[in-house]
From Swiss-Prot:
This is Protein crossbronx-like. Belongs to the ubiquitin-conjugating enzyme family. FTS subfamily. Pfam families: UQ_con. Coiled coil: none annotated. SUPFAM superfamilies: UBC-like. InterPro entries: UBQ-conjugat_E2_core (IPR000608), UBQ-conjugating_enzyme/RWD (IPR016135). Residues 17-179 form the UBC core domain.
Length: 256
């Protein structure tokens, strides 16, 4: 074995190991059977997840909010937190009106792989919309949240002093989410969560297929081998780095 190939092989093994851990995170979400919120790794990279939440009660009732979860490059080993970014600005104290990012620090300060999982983030997203007031009063540990540390001070001020005006501003976010539910995907990825308008013919055809005993065999695609799934977890940046390393090694060998 050439010594030059060892670092590249180690990186590939690390990526495969990371891919299995990401798949395990997705399986845990399925096991938790969370209601009204869904998330799935993208086809192109396991470090990018697509998510959507349906809210049926409270100040944000009837909304459908899309979001993305960006995992750190060394997930789950490194302590830095994942990044949650909503598709559109949502009027909420914990959501930045500029970047649309969600503040996760009330949930946790750093990522601990033996304690934290992506489903914790999904439950936190549910909690901030189900109880906006409660989400700004204290952290998960019961510690008070400094008012100067929220992402949207205007939303915080209205929530504390004028709930009616806060509801009006939140309604704008709700209406936008419903109006753009059926928009074309902003990214070409087979795993992006899309919605289609109700079509009676399609609905009836699907119901007939579900009544068939062989509906699963008729409709379910063949499950790819784990190695194929894991291979899809590698990000484009990491693949480029591997290719560049191989080019450098090949150039060095030719000179020798």
């Amino acid at each position: 074995m050439c010594l030059e190939t060892i670092p590249t092989n180690n990186k590939t093994l690390a990526l495969i190991n990371q891919g299995y851990k990401v798949l395990a995170e997705y399986q845990m979400i399925e096991q938790k059977q969370l209601k009204g919120i869904y998330a799935i790794p993208s086809y192109s990279s396991g470090l990018l997840w697509f998510g959507v939440i349906f809210i049926h009660s409270g100040l944000y009732a009837e909304s459908v909010f899309r979001f993305s979860i960006l995992l750190p490059d060394q997930f789950p080993e490194e302590s830095s937190l994942p990044t949650v970014i909503f598709q559109k600005d949502i009027f909420h104290p914990h959501i930045c009106p500029v970047s649309h990012s969600l503040d996760l620090t009330p949930l946790l300060k750093e990522w601990k792989k033996d304690q934290h999982h992506i489903w914790h983030i999904l439950k936190y997203i549910q909690a901030i919309f189900a109880d906006p007031e409660g989400s700004v009063c204290s952290t998960q540990n019961g510690d008070p949240i400094p008012l100067t540390e929220v992402n949207n001070m205007e939303a915080m001020r209205l929530l504390a002093n004028n709930r009616v005006d806060f509801a009006v501003r939140a309604k704008v976010s709700i209406l936008w989410s419903c109006q753009h539910m059926f928009d074309e995907p902003p990214i070409k990825d087979p795993h992006y969560i899309i919605f289609e308008r109700y079509c009676p013919e399609k609905h009836q055809a699907m119901m007939e297929r579900l009544k068939s005993r062989s509906w699963y065999e008729l409709s379910a695609p063949k499950t790819p081998k784990p190695s194929v799934c894991v291979a899809r977890m590698e990000s484009a940046r990491q693949l480029i780095e591997d290719e560049e390393a191989q080019v450098v090694n090949a150039a060095g060998s030719s000179l020798n």
